């Protein structure tokens, strides 16, 4: 059970960090949505 909790926390933390960086800085990956 502990492994599942730690995995969930790790994924959620990485997701939040990636989300924050993605919205703070312009995505370096070419996206068709922007232009």
Swiss-Prot record:
Where is it localised? Plastid, Chloroplast thylakoid membrane
Keyword line: Chloroplast, Membrane, Photosynthesis, Photosystem II, Plastid, Thylakoid, Transmembrane, Transmembrane helix
Query: What Pfam families would the database entry show?
Result: PsbT
Where mainly found? plastid
Spans traversing the lipid bilayer:
3-23
Task: Please provide, in alphabetical order, the Gene Ontology terms of the cellular component aspect for this entry.
Answer: chloroplast thylakoid membrane; photosystem II reaction center
In the record, biological process GO terms are:
photosynthesis
Q: Which domain of life is it from?
A: Eukaryota
What is its membrane topology? Single-pass membrane protein
Family in the record? Belongs to the PsbT family.
Check the record and name the HAMAP family matching this protein.
PSII_PsbT
Its assembly, as annotated, is:
PSII is composed of 1 copy each of membrane proteins PsbA, PsbB, PsbC, PsbD, PsbE, PsbF, PsbH, PsbI, PsbJ, PsbK, PsbL, PsbM, PsbT, PsbY, PsbZ, Psb30/Ycf12, at least 3 peripheral proteins of the oxygen-evolving complex and a large number of cofactors. It forms dimeric complexes.
Q: Report the protein's function.
A: Found at the monomer-monomer interface of the photosystem II (PS II) dimer, plays a role in assembly and dimerization of PSII. PSII is a light-driven water plastoquinone oxidoreductase, using light energy to abstract electrons from H(2)O, generating a proton gradient subsequently used for ATP formation.
Q: What is this protein called?
A: Photosystem II reaction center protein T
Q: Which organism is it from?
A: Drimys granadensis
Q: Source organism lineage?
A: Eukaryota, Viridiplantae, Streptophyta, Embryophyta, Tracheophyta
Its gene?
psbT
């Amino acid at each position: 059970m502990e492994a599942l909790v730690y995995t969930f926390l790790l994924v959620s933390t990485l997701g939040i960090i990636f989300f924050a960086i993605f919205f703070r800085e312009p995505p370096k990956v070419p996206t068709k949505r922007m232009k």
